[in-house]
Structures are given as C-alpha cells and as structure tokens.
A protein has these predicted regions:
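Active-site phosphate-binding strand-loop segment of PLP-dependent enzymes
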Residues: 27-83
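Active-site C-terminal subdomain of aminotransferase-like
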Residues: 77-80, 87, 92-198, 211
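PLP-dependent enzyme catalytic core of the Aspartate aminotransferase-like
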Residues: 221-224, 232-272
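Conserved PLP-binding catalytic core of the aspartate aminotransferase-like
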Residues: 174-183, 188-223, 233, 237-238, ...
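Single conserved hydrophobic/aromatic residue that forms the stacking wall/gate
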Residues: 1-6, 10
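Helix C-cap/helix->beta junction micro-motif
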Residues: 22, 76-77, 190, 222, ...
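Active-site-proximal loop->helix
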Residues: 14-23
C-alpha cells in the first residue's frame, strides 16, 4: 500500500470525505483513545506514508484532542499530523490560538484546517495551512479547492479583521471563557448532566432521542434556539442538546437560557 490515514471516530464529515478522496487505507480509533491509535499506527507500518487526522475540539462533546500525545505517537511511528481547528481556533488556548497553544504542540502539526464559519465571523469558507510544499501541492491537485468558487472579498476582509482582533486583544476570548464557565456551572448546579468541556460547546445530556427533540422545540417556544442531536449524528442512547456559547451573549441572556432550560426540564421530567 502507498498511504494510510488513521482518524478519530468522532471526526468531522469533511475529514471523512477527505480520507475517501485520497484513497488511503483507512484506520479508525475510538475517540481520543491513544492505545487504539498506537495499534492503528503499528498496523499501518506497511504503508509508505501515514497521517493522523483529528478534530482539535470534537463538535458533539466539546472535548479536546490530546494533541501532545498524538504528536508523540506520530514521531514514534513516522506519521504526519492533521488537525481540524474548526471548533477550537479562536476559542481554545489562553489566547484562542487553538489546540496547539493549549497542548503546546506548535511546530509538531503538519496540516491545519479550519472554517471561517464559526469563531472567525460566522461567514462561510475555510482554510488549510501548513508547510509551503504541502500547500503548493494542494493548490494544484485538491479537487474540492480547484473546482470551488473563490470566496467573496467581503468575507475575506472581515475574516482577516477577526484574525487581527484576536491577535491584538484577548478581551473577547476572555469574555467567551467567562460565559462558558458561568453557563456550565449554573446548569450543573441546577441538576443537568453536562459533558466536561474546554471549548464553547456545552452538551446537555438527555440520552433519549424523542426527548431531545421535544426539549429543543419547547426551548424554541421559550425564545431559546438550540439543537437536539440523536443517532446517527451521535451514538445510540447519547442524545443531547448542544449549546454553543458566544462572547456576545450577555449575562441576562445566559440567565434567560438557564431559566428556560430549568422550566422545560421540570415540565418534561428531566429535573425533579
């Protein structure tokens, strides 16, 4: 075999499509499970090239990939590392510089991908960055890039301004962290089952699929827009409401959302 890709089972759909397009031999490991990743890399030694593909922050749970351990294994088994920073860039790390800042893996990751549709202004489009040789090759041979329209100048301009703001001022990022901690702590104190998070994603676990949809619909009636996820988007029996916090949320808005969660929770028997 020529190449192989080992990827986390909770990876984004874009990584799934990318692995399919590159026709590499596929290996999958359980979410953030380094023992399984090591077994995948051992099996992949027969291939000439190996790449580990992971999200920086996993979109359904909000947990962070252990990038330092992933990079250690990549060096041990001579593999490239690709991380999708869509949910982590602008959010994770002391200054919002993503999982490489949080895990101190600058210079150890070969390819970064990300989106302009989340922390960087909520527009559309995305980016890939890495060593010049890799980017030059992608410019010439990446079909999704080659045969897509260019982004509008207004989107590029706005996104560059967001990059500049994040680099010069940490106050927006600090406000986001405060909001996430406040919402999570208040929700847990109210009795909700919240997944541990180091990101702006807060997963309120309900486990029952129909309940997650009824809950989301009732919250919308209360003026709170959230999404209920269930199988096949998440594993069976792992239905949840995903809440994404923003630096733009005021304390009053967060209190309104928490009050609505509690009210509906009591109505539907989630809270006693």
């Amino acid at each position: 075999g020529y190449s192989s890709a080992a990827s986390d089972v909770y990876k984004r759909q874009s990584i799934i499509d990318g692995v399919r397009l590159c026709k590499a031999k596929r290996y999958r490991y359980a979410n953030a499970n380094m023992e399984e990743l090591e077994k995948c890399l051992q099996e992949a030694q027969a291939q000439r090239f190996r790449i580990i593909c992971t999200d920086g922050v996993f979109s359904m749970d909000g947990n962070v990939a252990p990038m330092d351990k992933i990079c250690d294994l990549a060096e041990k088994y001579d593999a490239l590392v690709m991380v999708d920073e869509s949910h982590s860039a602008g959010v994770v790390g002391a200054t919002g510089h993503g999982v490489s800042e949080l895990c101190k893996t600058y210079g150890r990751v070969d390819i970064y991908t990300g989106t302009l549709g989340k922390a960087f202004g909520g527009a559309l489009g995305g980016f890939t960055t890495g060593r010049k040789e890799i980017i030059d090759m992608l410019r010439q041979s990446s079909r999704p890039y080659l045969f897509s329209n260019s982004l509008a100048p207004s989107i590029i301009g706005a996104s560059l301004e967001v990059f500049k703001m994040l680099k010069e001022d940490n106050s927006i990022h600090d406000r986001l962290v405060e909001n996430v901690n406040y919402f999570r702590d208040k929700m847990m104190a109210a009795g909700f089952d919240i997944k541990p998070t180091q990101s702006a994603i807060c997963a309120v676990m309900l486990y029952d699929a129909p309940l997650s949809q009824r809950y989301a619909n009732r919250l919308l009636e209360e003026g709170i827009y959230v999404t209920g996820f269930y199988y096949p988007v998440v594993p069976k029996g792992e239905a949840r409401i995903r809440v994404q916090l923003s630096a733009g949320h005021t304390r009053e808005q967060l209190d309104k959302a928490i009050a609505a969660f509690v009210k509906v929770g009591k109505e539907l028997g989630v809270l006693k």
